[in-house]
Amino acid sequence: NWMNNDFMKIENNQILSQALYSFDLSIFSLYPSLTTGGTLISLSRDETTNFKLLFERLNKTVINTWISTPSFVDICLLDPSFTEKEHPQLVQFILCGEELTKKTAEKLLTAFPSANIYNTYGPTEATGAISSVKITKELLTENDRVPIGFAKPGVDLKIMDKEIIIVGDSVAKGYFENPEKTEQAFFTVDGKPAYHTGDAGSISADGMLRYQGRIDFQVKFNGFRIELQDIEAN
């Protein structure tokens, strides 16, 4: 219930749904809107691929909670009217699916200085986000790279050989009909399910998780995973 407890306390919440429903980020908007009586604001494929249509739709739509990938909000920041002055009801941003760059975080904080902006982190294999942190000027000043937050309830984060390991009940059992890949990625720690994220990272004394890049050849584009070796091979 942490999603509802942390982010869904806005009455009559109008929640943006940017992600495709085949993308795990979509559950951030879909299920909280259903369980809290909010309204789901869906964008058409044309609106997400045509900037003119996108900006027109946003300028005539009331949104309270914005849920998207960082790259999508970066696109929207190209519109001069995407500001707190023009969108006073937009009071919360929840970003996930790829790294939030410091540049994008600074631009968003400048455009919406009163909004609550959260950077979240978590792979599909751990049922979505497993950590989050509120973006502030102080946080950005103190860090060269935007941190990815503190662990959510039921999640234990570890660093093993510089890799972020997720431990807890949110970790999946494995990949469907792919035992070889399952064996490579999933294991147990003290009898609890654990997952190799493939992300390099560190955890500070106060529990803050920081992302330090990939330890393999995988990159993310608009939230989707791309294996560079597959591109080279094909």
Question: Could you describe each region identified by the protein language model?
Answer:
Residues 19-23, 46-47, 71, 124:
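Conserved AMP-binding
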Residues 35-39, 63-67, 77-143, 156:
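Gly/Ser/Thr-rich phosphate-binding loop
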Residues 1-14, 24-64:
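Conserved AMP-binding/adenylation subdomain of ANL enzymes
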Residues 116-119, 134-234:
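AMP-dependent adenylate-forming
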Residues 71-73, 100, 171:
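Alpha-helix capping/helix-boundary segments
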Residues 14-16, 22, 28, 41, ...:
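Short, well-ordered beta-strand segments
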